[in-house]
């Protein structure tokens, strides 16, 4: 959290790391799992941030051979990922709303507590 968050006035700021869990409850198209997320094999750094801010990350990824994977879930599937990985949530394609439940876990190696929020 501390790596890329400028706001310091909330409880989770004190943690160095965060991961997320996403539970798929309903897909946008009942006949197709659909892509819930795209995870890039690239951790956020200050070097990457301008490409995200300027919407040029896809070009940066292609030039640097950064792989990606599509997360396709069925209702009831749960996945966890390091939120420092560059990730995208594609627009909903289908007639139904996409419904997920997300939980976030913050932690640091120098802190005995973890923080969970949703």
Language-model segments: which ranges?
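Catalytic core of non-heme Fe(II) oxygenases with the double-stranded beta-helix
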Residues: 1-69
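Catalytic core of Fe(II)/2-oxoglutarate
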Residues: 50-118
């Amino acid at each position: 959290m501390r790596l890329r968050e400028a706001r310091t006035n909330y409880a989770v700021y004190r943690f160095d790391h965060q991961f997320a869990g996403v539970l798929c409850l309903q897909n946008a198209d009942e006949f197709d799992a659909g892509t819930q997320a795209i995870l890039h094999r690239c951790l956020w750094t200050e070097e990457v941030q301008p490409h995200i801010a300027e919407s040029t990350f896809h070009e940066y990824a292609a030039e640097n051979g950064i792989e990606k994977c599509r997360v396709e879930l069925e209702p009831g599937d749960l996945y966890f990922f390091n939120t420092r990985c560059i990730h995208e949530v594609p627009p909903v394609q289908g007639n139904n709303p996409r419904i997920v439940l997300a939980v976030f876990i913050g932690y640091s190696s120098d802190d005995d507590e973890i923080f969970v929020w949703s």
